[in-house]
């Protein structure tokens, strides 16, 4: 009953961004790291973050970034090849598996995603930023830009399913577009795979539709 209020607000819990309680986001330092292409990349300095070299030794974030920058050309020659690989769930999985074997697994890439303030973006944006200093695009903006091309040619039922998949992608990330996730997505939307097959025209059409739309999601026009 007093003004200003003196009520105990209780613990606020750790910050969703920095993971600290109280939040230390404003205290974070930004590091500018010049890579071998002569361009700078900006990352957040996160004291609690540890990176490791291929031989298991602790390294700095700068060393990690330099090493990743030097390694990525082994997997794709240019931005267009990265885009082509990433736009197909089969080749994307192969790339992610190879990166993981080289010491750049999803955990490391997700940490780097936080450090470049791209948590609402795609892992594609992380690789593109490191390789070509391209500005990350939010998943929502990517979807909005590509919607017209994605839905062109789909019937109403297919439109509804892909719209559902895209909503999951915006909420969670690129892992929702993995082929392994397709059965779960169908069950979430239609309760059973049999019902999904009946509504959407069969297993093969579902698979083709799920793979085909991703090409438009990652096309240059959508970036």
Task: Indicate residue ranges for each PLM-predicted region.
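Catalytic cores and motor modules of nucleic-acid processing enzymes
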Residues: 8-223
């Amino acid at each position: 009953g007093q003004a200003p209020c003196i009520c105990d607000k209780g613990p606020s819990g750790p910050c969703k961004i920095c993971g600290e309680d109280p939040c230390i986001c404003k205290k974070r330092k930004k590091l500018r790291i010049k890579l071998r292409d002569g361009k700078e990349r900006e990352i957040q300095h996160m004291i609690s973050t540890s990176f490791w070299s291929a031989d298991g030794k602790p390294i700095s974030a700068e060393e990690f970034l330099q090493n990743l920058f030097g390694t990525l050309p082994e997997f794709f020659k240019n931005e267009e090849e990265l885009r082509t690989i990433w736009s197909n769930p089969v080749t994307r999985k192969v790339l992610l598996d190879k990166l993981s074997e080289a010491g750049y697994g999803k955990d490391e890439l997700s940490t780097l995603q936080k450090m470049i303030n791209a948590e609402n973006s795609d892992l594609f944006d992380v690789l593109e930023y490191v390789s070509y200093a391209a500005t990350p695009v939010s998943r929502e903006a990517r979807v909005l830009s590509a919607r017209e091309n994605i839905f062109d040619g789909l019937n109403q039922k297919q439109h509804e399913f892909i719209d559902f998949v895209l909503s999951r992608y915006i909420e969670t990330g690129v892992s929702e577009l993995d082929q392994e996730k397709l059965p779960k997505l169908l069950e979430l939307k239609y309760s059973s795979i049999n019902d999904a097959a009946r509504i959407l025209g069969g297993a093969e059409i579902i698979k083709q539709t799920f793979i085909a739309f991703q090409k438009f999601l990652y096309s240059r026009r959508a970036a």
